[in-house]
A protein has these predicted regions:
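Extreme N-terminal tail/first-helix region
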Residues: 1-19
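Charged, gly/pro-rich active-site loop segments
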Residues: 2, 79-147
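Short amphipathic alpha-helical segments
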Residues: 6, 54, 59-63
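A generic structural signal for nonpolar/aromatic side chains embedded in well-ordered alpha-helices
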Residues: 14, 58-59, 101-102
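Short Pro/Gly-enriched beta-strand edge/turn motifs at strand-loop
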Residues: 15-21, 105-108
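Short beta-strand segments
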Residues: 17-51, 59, 66-70, 82
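Short, solvent-exposed aromatic-acidic interface loops
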Residues: 50-54, 104
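Short, surface-exposed beta-strand-loop junctions and turns on beta-sheet-rich folds
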Residues: 53-55, 74, 138-140
Length: 147
């Protein structure tokens, strides 16, 4: 399978998935937080979080992160991604992301007068490497996609 086909399968996981397990490292060790996420065409992953949470604070000090998104259910072939990259806080309301975020969670589309952040901030993870697990096509042989 060609690299473009691997990217299409990765995009399928990002489109179907909504919950990312985000791994960070801080002065207290390793930590994982589940966050609702959306993505863009360049495979960047976005989420909203309270800036005071452990994972948000850790990203300010060490932006190297890892994560997983799995979209398979019991009885289905495994389909998911594991990835590493760099994360950072981004400024602004980002209505484009807010609309995608609310739609993905089956919530009404926000109005521009709504306080969609409610004290939270947007963050972006730019992957440098993505491992695809697609049991239907590859068994448990991970397909590596370098960015």
């Amino acid at each position: 399978m060609e690299n473009k086909d691997i990217k299409i399968l990765i995009q399928e996981v990002l489109e179907k998935g909504y919950l990312m397990s985000l791994g960070i490292v801080d002065e207290d060790g390793v930590w994982v937080a589940d966050v609702y996420c959306v993505h863009d065409d360049d495979l960047n992953i976005y989420w909203m979080s309270d800036p005071d949470t452990r994972h948000s604070q850790a990203i300010l000090k060490n932006n190297k992160v890892a994560g997983t998104i799995t979209v398979s259910n019991k009885g289905e072939d495994n389909l998911g991604i594991q990835f590493e990259g760099v994360a950072q806080k981004i400024e602004g309301v980002r209505w484009d992301l807010a609309k995608k975020h609310f739609t993905k969670r089956n919530k009404p589309e926000p109005q521009e007068s709504d306080d969609v952040l409610d004290g939270d901030s947007w963050y972006v993870l730019q992957p440098t490497k993505i491992d695809l697990i697609c049991e239907r096509y590859f068994g448990f042989d991970k397909q590596i996609f370098e960015l």
